[in-house]
UniProtKB/Swiss-Prot annotation:
GO terms for cellular component: nucleus. GO terms for molecular function: DNA binding. Residues 1-25, 154-176 are annotated as: Disordered. Keywords: DNA-binding, Nucleus, Transcription, Transcription regulation. Pfam families: B3. It is found in: Nucleus. It comes from the Eukaryota. The lineage of its organism: Eukaryota, Viridiplantae, Streptophyta, Embryophyta, Tracheophyta. The keyword Acetylation does not apply. This is B3 domain-containing protein At3g18960. SMART domains: B3. Residues 29-122 bind DNA.
Amino acid sequence: MVTTQNTKARVTSVSHRRSQQDPESPVKKFFKLVLPSTMKDKMMKIPPRFVKLQGSKLSEVVTLETPAGFKRSIKLKRIGEEIWFHEGWSEFAEAHSIEEGHFLLFEYKENSSFRVIIFNVSACETKYPLDAVHIIDSDDDIIDITGKEFVGTQGTRKNNQSVNGGDTEHKSKKRSRDIELDKILHDLDVMNPMHVLKEEEEDKRVFRG
C-alpha cells in the first residue's frame, strides 16, 4: 500500500512539474456567432482568450481570406484589453452576405492573417464569392492577335506603343517573317533534284557553245 501511494505521489509530482514547464499551446482557431449587435456595430470582437495568447502578435491591420481566395485587409480596433475587427469588416461581411445567425470559423495563419470559413443558417458552408480584384490580376499580360498588350479587362495598354506605332511595328515584324520564309523556300527550291538537273543541262549547253 505504501508503495502504491508513493508511486501515485511521484506521478502527481512529475505531472505537476511538466504542466509548469511546458508553455501553454497557443490557440490558433476560434469561432464567432453573428449576433444582432455584430450587425448593428459593424465590427466583430475577437475572443478574449485568443487576444490574451496571440493579441501581441497582431499588427494594426490583418488579412481575412476565404477558401475561395477572397482577401481583404481589416483594421483592428483596440479598446482596453479587447480587440475588434473594425474598418473593412462591414464590407467583408456585405461581400459574403453575412447575417445574424451565421457561424464563422477563424484560423490564425501567422503574419496577422486569418482563414475564415463561413456557415449560414442552414448550418452548411456558404458559397463564397470570387474576388474581383484577384480576377483582374489574373488577367494581366493578355496579348491579342494584333500583337498589342493590355492589362486585365480595362484595356489599358502596358507597353509604350501608340495605336499607329503598334501597327507599324507589327507590319515591320510581319515583313521580317515574310523575308525569312522566302529565304527558306528558296533554299528548299535549290535543293530540289529537278532544279539541280536543269542547272547541269544549262552548264552543258554553255560549255558546248
